[in-house]
């Protein structure tokens, strides 16, 4: 399914590192929902650390960050602790939300083709509508770009 800006973000429930079950529709503020391939890999670590560094500014702009990957809660907790990540990580081991949000697709690395998570960020407003989507994200300065867009809401 191809999601678009100005459309309602699909609701979902997933296990989280902070509360037992996270439900999107229960959050009544702006949300930065970013999908990343794997805990403790170079690009994913940089992205998590960058969002973490900006977490206070994001909070001041009435928003919260949530990262989603197919890693387990156990893996997420280890990743959070190792890098002092200041926001919640959600586990989608069954790929249900990853597929619902259209971020599962063909990728290639070192000439090898495979299926995986396409690094994507959704900025969702407090009414649950998608404000902006970043696909095939380049990690460098991405968190700053998202914060800049958040300030426009």
Language model segments and positions:
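Chalcogenol-based redox active-site neighborhoods
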Residues: 1-153
């Amino acid at each position: 399914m191809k999601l678009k800006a100005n459309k309602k973000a699909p609701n979902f429930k997933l296990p989280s590192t902070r509360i037992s079950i996270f439900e999107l529709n229960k959050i009544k503020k702006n949300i930065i929902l970013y999908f990343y391939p794997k805990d403790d890999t170079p690009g994913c670590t940089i992205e998590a650390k960058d969002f973490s560094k900006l977490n206070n500014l994001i909070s001041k702009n009435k928003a919260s960050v949530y990262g989603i990957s197919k890693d387990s809660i156990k893996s997420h907790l280890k990743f959070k602790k190792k890098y002092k990540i200041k926001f919640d990580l959600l586990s989608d081991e069954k790929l249900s939300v990853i597929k619902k949000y259209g971020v599962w697709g063909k990728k290639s690395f070192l000439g090898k083709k495979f299926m995986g998570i396409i690094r994507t960020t959704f900025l969702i407003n407090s009414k649950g509508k998608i404000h902006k989507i970043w696909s095939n994200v380049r990690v460098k300065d991405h968190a700053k770009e998202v914060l800049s867009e958040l300030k426009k809401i």
